[in-house]
Amino acid sequence: MMDASKELQVLHIDFLNQDNAVSHHTWEFQTSSPVFRRGQVFHLRLVLNQPLQSYHQLKLEFSTGPNPSIAKHTLVVLDPRTPSDHYNWQATLQNESGKEVTVAVTSSPNAILGKYQLNVKTGNHILKSEENILYLLFNPWCKEDMVFMPDEDERKEYILNDTGCHYVGAARSIKCKPWNFGQFEKNVLDCCISLLTESSLKPTDRRDPVLVCRAMCAMMSFEKGQGVLIGNWTGDYEGGTAPYKWTGSAPILQQYYNTKQAVCFGQCWVFAGILTTVLRALGIPARSVTGFDSAHDTERNLTVDTYVNENGEKITSMTHDSVWNFHVWTDAWMKRPDLPKGYDGWQAVDATPQERSQGVFCCGPSPLTAIRKGDIFIVYDTRFVFSEVNGDRLIWLVKMVNGQEELHVISMETTSIGKNISTKAVGQDRRRDITYEYKYPEGSSEERQVMDHAFLLLSSEREHRRPVKENFLHMSVQSDDVLLGNSVNFTVILKRKTAALQNVNILGSFELQLYTGKKMAKLCDLNKTSQIQGQVSEVTLTLDSKTYINSLAILDDEPVIRGFIIAEIVESKEIMASEVFTSFQYPEFSIELPNTGRIGQLLVCNCIFKNTLAIPLTDVKFSLESLGISSLQTSDHGTVQPGETIQSQIKCTPIKTGPKKFIVKLSSKQVKEINAQKIVLITK
């Protein structure tokens, strides 16, 4: 028997964190374990009890998941002195210096994602230590990886950028909502790896970004005792955080990781924010995407149907589809070897719980190419996403005739769904319109051909798509966004094929609602009868500010005014309808910050706001946040009267170098949020 004192033993493994982190683009992760990307070489330094001899045994064992097994690809055994290809993993000795040896390890570009234990076996001795844990991620820098992205600027944006924004508001009034993705913050990657374990994925499924993406999408929403975030669209957020108050993903994922309890509460941009963070952390290129006038087609018939009574009020018992002023989801970049050729690239993934897919609340990944072509049965959930961005919209008038309900199509819009699909531009703080990636131009022959193709695939009767009758009346409604506290004007534009003098009855029904279309308060009905002459004429309805101002303070959401307008020509009984949404505009505020700062030196942010509105603002707060600089800080300012100016100083001390984005927010009972931001370069 060999003398134990002469047996080779590994005393310590040096993961050479600094060098490996730079080459693997993982230096910013705040985690105690080394982080590597698959398909790329990394180096280890083994500290031995004696110089390595030719007769010594030396094997590296990488294991992941419960009961690791070579047959299941969850255990990889490598001998660095006998170059071999073990499931496309390789190890070679690079350098020997006394009692230290350097080993180069290259994992497979198809390796299982997640947490690995590294053990080193030397004869009868095995070095096992919880310190020798490593994380293995997808690698968009590796050509053989399914998530390979060829453009370096895009990799920097969709993998390495930890700040960004969501686009919210309305199609005519798009607003930027800054968002800290924070994929490198403490415990965020640990949370993402933990979510892989908690999901229904088998370890071998974790090789495939399609399956990982789908599983992470499902894990974002709470269901059956599992999931990160609880959705809430009621307007009552007692016991949690109102969705609009979140400014980033990291606090949500950190809270979930620390408590293992679902976080309260989220809406679409919050779900999209945390999914984008999780995918970027795991190495899947991801971007936040917003579609305006986004449809929710519950009947899965590629149309959005709204039913109204003769007063212009929505009949909720019949109307199950909805149109959201905006909806935010995530695009993820990957190859799709599970599909026919041509569907690689961006895939839509929607973490907001809307409809079940294969029994769980998740949507996608759906190839943008399939959505654009109308290939609605390409997996996953392409039919649902297609309807979100390219459905037709019908408004039905329900009339009682001799005690029976009669349905009349009073509006059919083929261009109103899926406007201004937006994402942050690569390397710039500006909006990029990517509508063309989702569909052909509205009204083009290609777009109509795609709709015909989609309906043919659906094998649906298309009675409603045939002209009901020749329309001699066409109507549109215009309304500019209004400064909070002012009256709102709705201009009804009527176009006729005759210039004859006629009488028109205009009925407008107005309500305060959430961006999802949920009614929060009935405001009023406005009626007007006018004589019109000429082929084009205008009629204006004015909504007084008193009808909406008192309802704002009771809402803990960003509201919009919905106007539903019905016009009827008295002489011909011709009826048309249109729906219009109006958002509120708010005064801006200014921030004063230096352009540069240093680690350890105090930074002071001066916030200045003048209330130029005609109403007082109550419960006014300033808040500031910056990744690596300052966690969320808030200062209270009570009530700010019309014309009054307030100032606030918020102080912080930087702890990380680089360009850092400061996000400052003002909020009140009446104004839910106004944002300002500035980038400060922090040096040593």
Swiss-Prot record:
Gene: TGM4
InterPro entries in UniProt: Ig-like_fold, Ig_E-set, Papain-like_cys_pep_sf, Transglutaminase, Transglutaminase-like, Transglutaminase-like_sf, Transglutaminase_animal, Transglutaminase_AS
Domain of life: Eukaryota
UniProt binding sites for Ca(2+): 390, 392, 442, 447
Catalytic activity from the UniProt record: L-glutaminyl-[protein] + L-lysyl-[protein] = [protein]-L-lysyl-N(6)-5-L-glutamyl-[protein] + NH4(+)
Keyword Transferase in record: yes
Assembly and oligomerization: Homodimer.
Gene Ontology cellular-component terms listed: collagen-containing extracellular matrix; cytoplasm; extracellular exosome; Golgi apparatus
Protein name: Protein-glutamine gamma-glutamyltransferase 4
Cofactor: Ca(2+)
Native source species: Homo sapiens
UniProt record similarity statement: Belongs to the transglutaminase superfamily. Transglutaminase family.
Tissues and organs where the protein is expressed, per its UniProt entry: Prostate.
